[in-house]
Amino acid sequence: MPVSTSGFDAPARLGTLLTAMATPFKPDGSLDIETAARLATRLVDAGCDGLVVSGTTGESPTTTDDEKILLLRTVLEAVGDRARIVAGAGTYDTAHSIHLAKASAAEGAHGLLVVTPYYSRPPQAGLVAHFTAVADATDLPNILYDIPPRSVVPIEWDTIRRLAQHPNIVAIKDAKADLHGGGQIIAETGLAYYSGDDALNLPWLAMGAVGFISVWGHLAASQLRDMLSAFASGDVATARKINVALGPLSAAQSRLGGVTLSKAGLRLQGFEVGDPRLPQIPANDVQLQALAADMRAASVLR
C-alpha cells in the first residue's frame, strides 16, 4: 500500500491540539473581529498549538466568503507564529471549495480542512474527484473531514486509500468513530489522524492519532494539552484520569451541539462571543444552568 505521507510532520505543520474556533458575533449579528483576535489569543495561551477557523463550530454555513477571509486574516495576525491556522474550505460545491481554498492560501493559512460534501450525497467516485480537485488547487496540506452524521455519506476506507496517494492530502479529521478501521488506515497509509469527537480523544490516541480537532478546547484546552502530554510520555493512567474528568462535557454537547456549547460555555467562563446566527440558537436559562453544572463537574467552571 502506498505511503503517501510518510515524510509529513503533522504535529509540526498542523499542530496537535486544534480548537475548532467559534466565530464571535456582535449583538447585531455582524462579525466581531476584535473579539475573534482575543479568542484566538486566549485559546493559544491555554495550550492550543493550532486553530481551525470557519469550521462547523465556526458556523461556516452562515458566514460569507469575505467574512471567512477577514476572520482568517485576523486570527493569523493575532497569534503570529505561535500556532498553526487551518482554514475551513469545504462546501457541497466543488468550485466554491476551490475558491475558498485558493483565497485561504493567498491569505497565508497553514492548512485546509475539507469536509465531505453534505446534502448532495455524492458517490465515492464523486468524493475522489471533489477532494482531488480541492487538493490540486493549492500547495497547502489538506485535512479531510469524515463526518457521516452531517454528510450522510462516509469517506469509505478504499476511497481514503486512494486519496492518501495525493501529496497534499495528509490527514483525516475523524467523526466516523470506527476506531479499528481508522487504526488500519493509519498503519497502511501514514495519514495523520485527528480525533473529531472529543468523547473519543483518548481512544484515538491509542489507535495512533496525532491529536484532536476539538470543540471542548474552548473550555478545557489546558486539560486536553495535559492529556496529550501524559499520553505521549507513557503516563496512560493520568491521561485516562483527565479523559474521565472531562466526561460531563460529552453530555452537555449531546444536548446543545458544538456551536451552542462553545458559545454558552465561554459566556459562563466570562468570555463573551455573542450568540450564534440562525438557524443555531443560544442556550436558554435552563440550558445554561445545566451546562454550568456539567462544567463544574468537569472542573472547567468554578
UniProtKB/Swiss-Prot annotation:
Protein's cellular compartments: Cytoplasm
Entry keywords, A to Z: Amino-acid biosynthesis, Cytoplasm, Diaminopimelate biosynthesis, Lyase, Lysine biosynthesis, Schiff base
Catalytic activity entry: L-aspartate 4-semialdehyde + pyruvate = (2S,4S)-4-hydroxy-2,3,4,5-tetrahydrodipicolinate + H2O + H(+)
Residues the record marks as site: Part of a proton relay during catalysis: T56, Y119
Cited SUPFAM superfamilies: Aldolase
EC nos: 4.3.3.7
Signal peptide: none
One Gene Ontology term of the molecular function aspect: 4-hydroxy-tetrahydrodipicolinate synthase activity
Residues at the active site: Y145, K173
HAMAP family xref list: DapA
PANTHER family: 4-HYDROXY-2-OXOGLUTARATE ALDOLASE, MITOCHONDRIAL (PTHR12128:SF66), DIHYDRODIPICOLINATE SYNTHASE (PTHR12128)
Protein name (record): 4-hydroxy-tetrahydrodipicolinate synthase
